[in-house]
Amino acid sequence: MGSRGSFVDIDKGDFTFVEGGQTFRKVAMVDDVVVLERFEGGVKAPDYSHSADRIYAVIQTQKAKNKKTGEYETVTRLKQLAFYDKNHDQKISVDFGHPHTGVRPHIHIDRIHDKNVPGIPPTKEQLELANKIIRRLKLDAY
């Protein structure tokens, strides 16, 4: 799976990958959702999808402190759901990793990440899809 901006020329419809630009790995499918894993760095869904009208779920395995025991443990969590349009462009992303103006999870529209815009909670359908992915893949809660 290509990284952000790793396609040859999206303006000309060339969605082949740039050499060395693959930073996501497809790990599963849940219904029509492609589940990708990012192994290092920040977790943001790709700006563009390889397929039109696609939904990606991005997960990441990392060390996290257990709130009850204080010990660090390995957890795998859903970090983002990303929805793409017919032009392969990301239209909505649901961010589970951190709060935005106090709202967690929250959505971003058209890849706009403006700290001055109030956080928008995900829809009921988006949360149901996230919870289905978490259940099916036995992920840790977000």
Model-assigned labels for residue ranges:
Residues 1-4:
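Non-Sec secretion/translocation targeting segments of pathogen effectors
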